């Protein structure tokens, strides 16, 4: 036994899959202020003020805007944070996710 009596090592290839990714979207409504949407984008999604303003305008003009693409757990957490903060502030802001 050339390896000093140790068993021969077996190499096992694990299949590594990329995590499923989800796009997080904000939806326009007639009550949530533009300022609140910008603050959500800055605080929850870590967008710069310029990026947040651009996304907010897309939400306002097109009815929906993309906040970012995240793994499932991160996306779900961000959606929950948006809904909790919006409800606490009295806004009906809707945030959804869709698989990429």
UniProtKB/Swiss-Prot annotation:
Residues folding into a coiled coil are none
Where does the record locate the signal sequence feature? none
Give the record's GO biological process terms.
Answer: protein catabolic process; proteolysis
Pfam families named among the record's database cross-references: ClpS (PF02617)
> Per its UniProt record, what InterPro entries does this chain match?
ClpS, ClpS_core, Ribosomal_bL12_C/ClpS-like
| HAMAP family the UniProt entry points to | ClpS (MF_00302)
Family statement? Belongs to the ClpS family.
Subunit: Binds to the N-terminal domain of the chaperone ClpA.
Function, as annotated, reads: Involved in the modulation of the specificity of the ClpAP-mediated ATP-dependent protein degradation.
Q: What is this protein called?
A: ATP-dependent Clp protease adapter protein ClpS
């Amino acid at each position: 036994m050339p390896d000093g009596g140790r068993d021969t090592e077996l190499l096992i290839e694990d299949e590594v899959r990329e995590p499923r990714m989800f796009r997080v979207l904000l939806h326009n409504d007639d009550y949530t202020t533009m300022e609140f949407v910008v603050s959500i984008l800055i605080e929850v999604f870590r967008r710069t003020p310029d990026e947040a303003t651009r996304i907010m305008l897309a939400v306002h003009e097109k009815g929906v805007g993309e906040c970012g693409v995240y793994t499932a757990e991160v996306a779900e957490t961000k959606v929950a944070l948006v809904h909790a903060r919006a409800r606490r502030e009295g806004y009906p802001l809707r945030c959804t996710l869709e698989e990429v």
